[in-house]
From Swiss-Prot:
It comes from Homo sapiens (Human). This is Growth factor receptor-bound protein 7. Homodimer. Interacts (via SH2 domain) with EGFR, ERBB2, ERBB3 (when phosphorylated), ERBB4 (when phosphorylated), EPHB1, INSR, FGFR1, PDGFRA (tyrosine phosphorylated) and PDGFRB (tyrosine phosphorylated). Interacts with SHC1. Interacts with RND1. Interacts (when tyrosine phosphorylated) with FHL2 and HAX1. Interacts (via SH2 domain) with RET and PTK2/FAK1. Interacts (when not phosphorylated) with ELAVL1. In stressed cells, but not in normal cells, part of a complex that contains at least GRB7, PTK2/FAK1, STAU1, ELAVL1 and TIA1. Interacts (via SH2 domain) with KIT (phosphorylated). Coiled coil: none annotated. Residues 1-96 are annotated as: Disordered. Residues 21-34 have a biased composition (Pro residues).
Length: 532
């Protein structure tokens, strides 16, 4: 009996594994169907996934717990994502809540810092009013916030209508940028000074045919009133991007932007090179131009695009020939960018200064102070002074009597160790800055605006008994030596070798606030520093 030990016949064709459409599963293959000759038993077979297996995997996935998405910002639409939103959302990685207060750090000139909670739409003027009240300072339109970038040696004064939170949000994270609270006498000087002093005739040119018959004064007045926009032109030294060499170009500031000519003073459009957009940039003063940028002069300024957050790349650094030229370019850039809004800020500042009651009563003044009245105790019984002029005259008489008592006390014989000078009344004045250097006094006056009449008094470093009056005139700081002299046991101070003598420095300053004397101008503004 012979047994058939050969392996059973197995079909490896695709038709055996995947039946034809319409054929129920499990139906045997017809026996008379021949095997395909091209299929070999040693070849691998492709087994397609059946629909039953896919349905089982779907049911298994739905039965598992859902895993939260750790990066929902990447799945949000670009308009709602702070990461995919583009430049408009580059102000911060997290959306800001307009209803929540924001913390702004403000520094004083002595380095002290104070944190202030402000609303999202708080302007620079609102923050200055808060700081003035906290510092117990006199409120006026000269206070301002200065945006400083020490790593770039750049700074600019914020306009009164600018949002402090928006400016701070544009700073690089972890940088050394800061706000500094100080006086800025040059903020509205363009509306107070004469047109010729701020905009020289050689730097103002009208590009419109309608202005050919207008005088220089009328053209400047229209410029200040934002009625027209003439060209500001002049030579500036420009450093190319990525280069350390400075080259002199003839530049033009127009409403459309800042340009420089590649061929002399030509205004042909073929020779004009576009530099920066006025509306999309801010202009800064360069504080350490020689050290950081290798400037040939100390009168540099920078045009920084708003989209630039960090680094030197993209900064357009300019260098002017003198301070008057730089002041003209800075003032024109502000007027071209803000236009009539700048003049509105000036009018609002003037109205607040003339009518302080519109701001409400200061919160630092207690209710009991409002009930105080002027009294006269010169007679046997006190009486209420109802006449305001009489009350003012009595206050002046009391102040003069107090000064006489102080002068009498200072004129008493004292040791020659300088104790009388250390107890002098001038040390309590805001314009007295003690023992600072000549360079430091020039820096302080330059920071608060190079306007005529800005002054301070300091101790002399060469003469231990003398003082120095530092005064700004024609955008230059001049220094006048004040020497003491003694006559009949009394001490006097003089700046003209004893021809005009004063009993103390306070009397000297008050005299030159009303009379020029040997000075080129009156003492108008005192350079002061307030601690926060």
């Amino acid at each position: 009996m012979e047994l058939d030990l050969s392996p059973p016949h197995l079909s490896s064709s695709p038709e055996d594994l995947c039946p034809a459409p319409g054929t129920p599963p499990g139906t045997p293959r017809p026996p008379d169907t021949p095997l395909p000759e091209e299929v070999k038993r040693s070849q691998p077979l492709l087994i397609p996934t059946t629909g039953r297996k896919l349905r089982e995997e779907e049911r298994r996935a739905t039965s598992l717990p859902s895993i939260p998405n750790p990066f929902p910002e990447l799945c949000s639409p670009p308009s709602q994502s702070p990461i995919l939103g583009g430049p408009s959302s580059a102000r911060g990685l997290l959306p800001r809540d307009a209803s929540r207060p924001h913390v702004v750090k403000v520094y004083s000139e002595d380095g002290a810092c104070r944190s202030v909670e402000v609303a999202a739409g708080a302007t620079a003027r609102h923050v200055c009013e808060m700081l003035v009240q906290r510092a117990h300072a006199l409120s006026d339109e000269t206070w301002g916030l200065v945006e400083c970038h020490p790593h770039l040696a750049l700074e600019r004064g914020l306009e009164d209508h600018e949002s402090v939170v928006e400016v701070q949000a544009a700073w690089p994270v972890g940088g050394d940028s800061r706000f500094v609270f100080r006086k800025n006498f040059a903020k509205y000087e363009l509306f107070k000074s004469s047109p010729h002093s701020l905009f020289p005739e050689k730097m103002v040119s009208s590009c419109l045919d309608a202005h050919t018959g207008i005088s220089h004064e009328d053209l400047i007045q229209n410029f200040l009133n934002a009625g027209s926009f003439p060209e500001i032109q002049g030579f500036l030294q420009l450093r190319g991007s990525g280069r350390k060499l400075w080259k002199r170009f003839f530049c033009f500031l127009r409403r459309s932007g800042l340009y420089y000519s590649t061929k002399g003073t030509s205004k042909d459009p073929r020779h004009l090179q576009y530099v920066a957009d006025v509306n999309e940039s801010n202009v800064y003063v360069v504080t350490q131009g020689r050290k950081l940028y290798g400037m040939p002069t100390d009168f540099g300024f920078c045009v920084k695009p708003n989209k630039l957050r960090n680094g030197h790349k993209g900064l357009r650094i300019f260098c002017s020939e003198d301070e008057q030229s730089r002041t003209c370019w800075l003032a024109a850039f502000r007027l071209f960018k803000y236009g009539v809004q700048l003049y509105k800020n000036y009018q609002q500042a003037q109205s607040r200064h003339l009518h302080p009651s519109c701001l409400g009563s200061p919160p630092l003044r207690s209710a009991s102070d409002n009930t105080l009245v002027a009294m006269d105790f010169s007679g046997h019984a006190g009486r209420v002074i109802e006449n305001p002029r009489e009350a003012l005259s009595v206050a002046l008489e009391e102040a003069q009597a107090w000064r006489k008592k102080t002068n009498h006390r200072l004129s008493l014989p004292m040791p020659a160790s300088g104790t009388s000078l250390s107890a002098a009344i001038h040390r309590t004045q805001l314009w007295f800055h003690g023992r600072i250097s000549r360079e430091e006094s020039q820096r302080l006056i330059g920071q608060q605006g190079l306007v005529d009449g800005l002054f301070l008094v300091r101790e002399s470093q060469r003469n231990p008994q003398g003082f120095v009056l530092s005064l700004c005139h024609l955008q230059k700081v001049k220094h006048y030596l004040i020497l003491p002299s003694e006559e009949e046991g009394r001490l006097y101070f003089s700046m003209d070798d004893g021809q005009t003598r004063f009993t103390d420095l306070l009397q000297l300053v008050e005299f030159h606030q009303l009379n020029r004397g040997i000075l080129p101008c009156l003492l108008r503004h005192c350079c002061t520093r307030v601690a926060l």
